[in-house]
Amino acid sequence: KEALVIWGELPTLELPVEREVWEQWWADYWQVSWIPEWDFVSTPPWLKLWYTLTKEPLAKEDVYYVDGACNRNSREGKAGYITQYGKQRVEKLENTTNQQ
């Protein structure tokens, strides 16, 4: 907010959602008393997909539990997954960080 005050001009932010969807969400979940001006732009297909994801796992479909880590000094690590049906895979990683 300090940068906005220093420059003396508030930017108009682009929100990739339809106005009606945003206003409904804002009415239910608002947490601040002030937000800058918004321009509502067309929603990319991947963002529409995100909002249509299911909340619970589908019956008889694999649920993947994913994890990974690496050693900070050697930069060697492992990443993998396991499903509720026991299918699993682990890969060794070299020259990596925990951010990748």
Swiss-Prot record:
GO biological process: DNA integration; DNA recombination; proteolysis; symbiont-mediated suppression of host gene expression
Domain of life, per lineage: Viruses
Signal peptide: none
Keywords (A to Z) from UniProt: Aspartyl protease, DNA integration, DNA recombination, Endonuclease, Eukaryotic host gene expression shutoff by virus, Eukaryotic host translation shutoff by virus, Host gene expression shutoff by virus, Host-virus interaction, Hydrolase, Multifunctional enzyme, Nuclease, Nucleotidyltransferase, Protease, RNA-directed DNA polymerase, Transferase
RNase H type-1 domain span: 58-100
GO function terms (MF aspect): aspartic-type endopeptidase activity; nucleic acid binding; RNA-directed DNA polymerase activity; RNA-DNA hybrid ribonuclease activity
Repressor in keyword set: no
Magnesium as UniProt keyword: no
Cross-referenced SUPFAM superfamilies: Ribonuclease H-like
InterPro entries the UniProt entry points to: Rev_trsase/Diguanyl_cyclase, RNaseH-like_sf, RNaseH_domain, RNaseH_sf, RVT_connect
Function text: During replicative cycle of retroviruses, the reverse-transcribed viral DNA is integrated into the host chromosome by the viral integrase enzyme. RNase H activity is associated with the reverse transcriptase.
Note: This is an African green monkey isolate.
Family according to the record: Belongs to the retroviral Pol polyprotein family.
Name of the featured protein: Pol polyprotein
Species classification: Viruses, Riboviria, Pararnavirae, Artverviricota, Revtraviricetes
